[in-house]
Amino acid sequence: YVSLGKDCPSGISWSVSGTGEYYSIGNYRKWAFYPQASLTYMKTPEHILQLSLSTQKTYPGYWEMQSSVSYINGYSEIWGTPGLRPQTNYSVNANYVVKQKYVFGAYFSRTQDQFMQTAYQSTERLAMIYKMMNWNYTQYVGLMATVPFRIGTWWDSRWVAVEQYARHRCDDFFDLPFDRKKWILQCQWDNTFKLNKNLTFELRGFMQTPAIQGTYDLKMVGTVDAGVKWTFAGDKATLSARCSDIFNTSMPECNLRYGGQDLSLIHISEPTRHLRI
């Protein structure tokens, strides 16, 4: 491990570090170097430019690497994957901060050897196979913006938007290799309303357009959260209530309609709506 950094009088500060590693499991052996770097330029607090490079390695779990088959029911099976390799994420981010509140950014993220469990309908027998596998990579390129605003003293709001281009590729997925691409938009709107000096109301909304996860298609999803806080007894006591996912819509509908596969995953569980007081 090595690390260097410096703060310059010109308003530039930077740091660079790196970690070397040798990993061995079974027949898989690999030397790897994981760099980290950051650069900040702040001539004045009104205009700040931030650049960063990061890497992160994630190892598969023990049970995921066992040579075993477990049965959910008479149709669905979970396969272990001996020799499952660790995944490595590389991310590059650039942010421009204006007046210490408006943020505009761009990013690139690539996860090499991404391991993920995906369903596959066997072409040899009547069986649904769930298996954790190493994909070639997942990759995202995107733009983001954070814009806060205020109306008087009673309404604070913040709008966040992320537009990204996703690509998922696996050349060794049973007999069904895939290389899928999708534009995805995410929007979040946070609002705080100060009704009077003792009563505050919060409202949050989130939305994501249809997305992909390997061979899966994820439909549009959205959530609405709300909360209220009352301060009384001379600001010595507070009563608050919050309801998350009011319309119970945070879990996306997931379908598989790729390469002759036909599957609809129906989410059956406790409601995602929660009320806390």
Q: Model features per residue range: what roles?
A:
Residues 16-18, 51-53, 104-106, 145, ...:
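Membrane-embedded beta-strand positions of outer-membrane beta-barrel proteins
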